[in-house]
Amino acid sequence: MALLEICCYSMECALTAQRNGADRIELCAAPKEGGLTPSFGILRSVREHITIPVHPIIRPRGGDFYYTDGEFAAMLEDIRLVRELGFPGLVTGVLTVDGDVDMSRMEKIMTAAGPLAVTFHRAFDMCANPFNALKNLADAGVARVLTSGQKADAAQGLSIIMELIAQGDAPIIMAGAGVRANNLQNFLDAGVREVHSSAGVLLPSPMRYRNQGLSMSADIQADEYSRYRVEGAAVAEMKGIIVRHQAK
């Protein structure tokens, strides 16, 4: 049966995902940055209270995936912490300035991760040649690749996702970006073994007093009075589609 991974940005989101049938969680912070490494407090509390597999993201900042030596050293320290806390896997990705997988750094990541399953995240979608990148990641021992098929969303990139799947059994190709209940069946019919979804909604902040003339963000247009939350009904609906597909 296809596996459903849900992207979560808090303990509350992780609990909702687990209760509604998620098979695995990608744990992140900073949704507006596309996901950054969670704090120690979030990592420890999720590790203590969530029973399904959780894979934290290792990403020190937003933007591109070419990191300074200092940033990369911090990534290795975060991997050490995630391993010490007992997580079964992690999510990360590093590129060269030319858009290739940085194999030298990936070797260091794989050594630091040890027995943990490593997912190469959507840095893959920024690679110059996805098919060469997949071969290199297979050689590195990466467990899976999260990809939208190098398009804005996975529905647009499905043909490339299918080509990547046809390239071999490993790494597992996990489709993500815009995967929802209304298009999930297309991915299952295409033979996608794992899907990744945020299943999220933005909820208004409970703050009654709001200083509308001030922002804590460099983006003055940012909405600081909304909060991301995993929608349990959306997770349950997707899990139901997967179960029914398996029963066919």
Curated annotation (Swiss-Prot):
Gene Ontology CC annotation, any one: cytoplasm
Cytoplasm recorded as keyword: yes
Pfam families named in the record: CutC (PF03932)
Positions of transmembrane segments: none
Compartment(s) where it occurs, according to its Swiss-Prot or TrEMBL record: Cytoplasm
MF-aspect GO terms: copper ion binding
Keyword annotations from UniProtKB, A to Z: Cytoplasm
SUPFAM superfamilies, sorted: CutC-like
Predominant subcellular localization, coarse grouping: cytoplasm
Coiled coil, from the record: none
InterPro entries, per database record: CutC-like (IPR005627), CutC-like_dom_sf (IPR036822)
Family, as annotated: Belongs to the CutC family.
Subunit structure: Homodimer.
Full protein name: PF03932 family protein CutC
Source organism: Salmonella paratyphi A (strain AKU_12601)
